Amino acid sequence: MSSTAAPPTPHRAPTAPETPLRRVPALAQALLAYVGVRALGLLVLSLWAHRQHHGVWPVLATQWDAEYYLGIADHGYAHQLGGMDGGNNLVFFPLYPVLVKAVAAVTPGSRATTGLCLAVAASLVAAWGVHAVGDRLHGHRVGILLTVLWAALPVGLVQWMGYTESLFTALAAWALYALLTDRPLTAAWLAVLAGLTRPTGIAVAAAVTVTCLLSWRRPRALAAAALAPLGWCAYVGWVSLRLGRWDGYFAVQRTWRNELDGGMETLRRFRSLLMYDSTPELFLVLVTVTLLASAALWALSARDRQPLPLLVFTGVTLLIVLTSGGVYFPRARYLLPAFPLLLPIAVRLARAPRRHRTLILTTAVLGSAYWGAYMALVWTGPP
């Protein structure tokens, strides 16, 4: 077996290669559970918004980052760097707004409607991919639990907003699945698309490249290793050409006060929120707990000997998020695509007594519904 394929696990006997479609009953359970969790979150948001006389549609489809993506679909990208007050739309990667523009051109309704529908559709493909990875490694029960846990993340509402997280998670999940099933070129092409979707697309490319370089004697693996980063590099290079400077994309990031600082800003925020702030903002506490829990889960994933592609993807994603010196509050959302971090929980829940499993999942689902509404209607900044 090549180094790109997952070794057999003690939880299920090795079987002949199969496609996800051959496990439709388990997949149907996972997707129904996913839709149920997200529908409950949407219901709680709607009821909360009704009590506040607040519309739900703008929250989901047209505010914050969604507004920028719609602006790119309508008017294209900026031609100049601008000042240091943020607002330059070159910071946003192009695949999602290009899809919005293309699909809206051949379908009825507004581009905002198209963008939201694309995000919801992508979330279903992402949930399918999350289930496929869990099922491949540990069986259908873990696959279903992993899907539910991903749906029930505190910032899970973003999966059904006009943002790129669902599209990116779908591409990342299926790229990882392709690596686990020894299809390096498929994984590489998906990594190219992921690299055109979000800055953290480089984490998907890293997972593909590192895994494939370990199979350097195989021409397909070497080709995949070279191909995987090209999407990310292409957009970053295009921004440099557009602005006429070699550091174009990173200069744009600096206008948003977002650049790598080795984690100093993260540590400062931790210290401020956990030690000095007597009345910290509740949403920032959630972000802090999410970051700390994610680091602990990565260590647990490594101890559990998770397959290398998953460890590289989540490790690079976590490294980027923790060492960024930019805005602090969206970092829980930035980690939303890093679903393999939830695998240790899913595996242990699968072994737990049903009563304990039900209690934990119910708490997670209800908590996600509450936090989604709080994030959208009480927290005054972007998710």
What kind of feature is each model-predicted range?
Residues 37-52, 56, 61, 205-210, ...:
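Membrane-lumen/periplasm interface segments of specific transmembrane helices
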Residues 63-78, 85-108, 263-267:
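Short hydrophobic/aromatic helix or loop-helix immediately within or flanking a transmembrane segment
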Residues 87, 94, 98, 106-125, ...:
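Loop-to-helix entry region of an early transmembrane alpha helix in multi-pass inner-membrane enzymes
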Residues 110-114, 130-152, 312:
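Transmembrane-helix signature of polytopic, membrane-embedded enzymes
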Residues 117-137, 295-299:
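Transmembrane-helix motifs of polytopic, lipid-linked glycan transferases
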Residues 151, 172-177, 185-213, 227-231, ...:
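Membrane-interface alpha helices of multi-pass inner-membrane proteins
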Residues 160-167, 331-332:
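Short acidic/glycine- and proline-prone juxtamembrane loop motifs at membrane-interface regions
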Residues 225-229, 351-382:
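Signature aromatic-anchored transmembrane alpha helix within multi-pass, membrane-resident enzymes
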